[in-house]
Swiss-Prot record:
Stored SUPFAM superfamilies: F-box domain
Domain F-box as annotated: residue spans: 3-49
The protein's name: Putative F-box protein At3g19560
Classification via PANTHER family: BNACNNG10540D PROTEIN, F-BOX PROTEIN CPR30-LIKE
CDD domains noted in UniProt: F-box_AtFBW1-like (cd22157)
InterPro entries documented for this protein: F-box-assoc_dom_typ1 (IPR006527), F-box-assoc_interact_dom (IPR017451), F-box-like_dom_sf (IPR036047), F-box_dom (IPR001810), SCF_F-box_component (IPR050796)
Species whose genome carries this gene: Arabidopsis thaliana
Domain of life: Eukaryota
Length: 361
């Protein structure tokens, strides 16, 4: 009888096997043998296979104080309408306590907790590494926290203190120097929503001009913080006339483009645009999808699949008499529609795409 040893498995076959291991099981797999650990920690392996599982991608969902790793399949449900498996499902819990917000950048998660306002936690679930960041002063959950990196891939954290506490300040933490600095510069704008995300190392916000605040509302713009120059860029145009009475949500497309969803609060019509060019000082847009959607998406999240021409929305459904349920909706052209109930919750689900990486913290 001939027995094949684990060490006899070809490199290609080993990569194929390990690429299918759930991220929540990686710690146990790495402890099996040195060869597996070295491969899983190889940046080229995580870049090649990270987040790609048979047309699926990974996402982090936070709701209340829980953070979960989700698998989202935008291809199967539309290709086979009789498919019973949901297009989104939980594949694991992330072991950080009392998470209020998660900000994703380059495979790292910046975690803001509910209870402890004396530290931030930077976490790489793929490598099972964490770093606690002590502030100059206390953190507050209603401030803005952003993770990014400069042109040399040096990671940094930006904290924008909320004006509701009587101060508008900016602080930046460098992983390289392990220290904070206070940034000071005049601005003619104000960040208007709890909407910010990372793209190519920089962070994008929604903002308005201070002098344009009126009773009828104010026009909003896109605003970029450049982590290389450690400065905000100019106000950039959105692809529509957007005022504060409008539901507006940002998302990324394959870590290369920015997408924006717009829905007026007094109408069902919902539109999505995708950038054709995105830089700290310039942006251009292309129309992507239009559909009618009755549910309020304020505070929610969404993803798009350009090839399938579909959007996946995550928001609270308040139609039930008892309790509030989180729901996911897949909507496409020609009236395509599918929904999945994610369970009862008093918190709107916040979703961000997640691609494992070997960035050290």
């Amino acid at each position: 009888m001939c027995m094949t040893m684990m060490s006899d498995i070809s490199q290609d076959l080993l990569e194929e096997i390990l690429s299918r291991v759930p991220i929540t099981s990686l710690r146990a797999v790495k402890s099996t043998c040195k060869r597996w650990k070295d491969l899983l920690n190889d940046p080229s392996f995580s870049k090649k296979y990270g987040g790609k599982r048979d047309n699926e991608f990974l996402a982090i969902m936070t709701s209340g104080s829980r953070a979960s790793l989700m698998s989202v399949n935008l291809h199967g449900p539309r290709d086979n309408k009789d498919l019973e498996d949901p297009f989104i499902k939980q594949i694991g819990e992330l072991n950080q306590d009392q998470i209020f917000k998660v900000f994703h950048c380059d495979g790292l998660l910046l975690c803001i907790t509910n209870e402890d306002n004396t530290r931030l936690v930077v976490w790489n679930p793929y490598l099972a590494q964490t770093r606690c960041i002590q502030p100059i002063d206390k953190f507050y959950i209603y401030d803005w926290y952003c993770l990014g990196y400069d042109k040399d891939k040096n990671h940094k954290i930006l904290v924008v203190y909320s004006p509701m506490f009587g101060r508008i300040e900016y602080e930046i933490y460098s992983f390289l120097s392990k220290s904070w600095i206070v940034l000071s510069f005049p601005t003619d704008w104000q960040i208007s929503r709890d909407e910010c995300l990372s793209l190519k190392g920089n962070t994008y916000f929604i903002a308005y001009k201070k002098m344009e605040v009126e009773e009828v509302g104010f026009q909003e713009f896109l605003l970029c913080f450049d982590f290389t120059n450690e400065r905000f860029g100019p106000l950039l145009p959105l692809p529509f006339q957007c005022y504060n009475q409008t539901s507006l949500v940002l998302s990324t497309v394959q870590e290369e483009q920015l997408a924006v969803l717009c829905k007026r609060c007094d109408a069902y019509e919902t539109k999505i645009w995708i950038t054709t060019k995105i830089e700290p000082n310039a942006v251009s847009w292309s129309y992507f999808l239009k559909f009618d959607f009755k549910v309020d998406i304020s505070g929610g999240s969404f993803f798009v699949d350009v090839e399938e021409k579909v959007a996946v929305l995550f928001c609270i459904n308040r139609e039930k008499e008892k309790g509030i349920n989180n729901k996911t909706y897949m909507i496409g052209e020609d009236g395509y529609y599918k929904e999945v109930d994610l369970g009862e919750s008093n918190w709107c689900p916040s979703m961000c795409s997640y691609v494992p990486s070997c960035v050290q913290v």
